[in-house]
């Protein structure tokens, strides 16, 4: 089975997390799907770069590329962007990349999971302050955010080229401070 992703919980420090939370008010209950590049997005990307550099995962080639292929994505309640593509069954594939969940709270019953096809896991819950590295050529999609959700699914995503495949996170996660 293909390794779908590497997950790192509590990715950013509480100070940085609190700064993010103070900047996402407009996204929490929006009724439309959004992909935005704002000053908050730039700040979060800088923090992600810092953390990935500490973990020896950052690739210098991404510095100029990530601003072009990243955004804050907001998935409101009921939105189903994936299943409208019947040929792929609600999944798509990229050259690898990451998703960092910035919504303030999440309950598993709200859906919105990151889902995978033909991988070692079927889905990953969008837990707040969770960083997920999606390996290259892995079919993935987004589950529908259910009507019981009290806030939207909000994530910072990036899909740079030249990404690496990570088969195990054991050593990487264990070095995270």
What is the predicted role of each segment?
Residues 1, 176-177:
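Short intrinsically disordered terminal tails
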Residues 1-71:
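Non-heme Fe(II)/2-oxoglutarate
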Residues 59-176:
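Catalytic core of non-heme Fe(II) oxygenases with the double-stranded beta-helix
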């Amino acid at each position: 089975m293909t390794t779908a992703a590497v997950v790192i919980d509590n990715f950013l420090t509480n100070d940085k997390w609190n700064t993010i939370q103070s900047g996402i008010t407009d996204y929490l209950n929006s009724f439309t799907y959004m992909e935005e590049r704002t000053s908050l997005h730039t700040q979060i990307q800088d923090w992600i770069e810092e953390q990935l550099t500490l973990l020896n995962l950052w690739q210098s080639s991404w510095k100029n590329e990530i601003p072009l292929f990243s955004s804050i994505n907001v998935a409101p309640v009921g939105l189903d962007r994936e299943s409208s593509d019947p040929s792929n069954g609600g999944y798509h594939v990229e050259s690898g990349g990451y998703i960092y969940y910035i919504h303030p709270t999440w309950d598993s019953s709200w859906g919105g999971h990151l889902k995978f096809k033909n991988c070692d896991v079927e889905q990953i819950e969008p837990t707040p302050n969770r960083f997920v590295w999606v390996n290259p050529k892995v079919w993935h999609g987004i589950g529908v955010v259910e009507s019981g959700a009290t806030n939207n699914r909000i994530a910072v995503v990036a899909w740079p080229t030249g990404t690496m495949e990570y088969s195990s996170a054991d050593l990487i996660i264990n070095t995270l401070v």
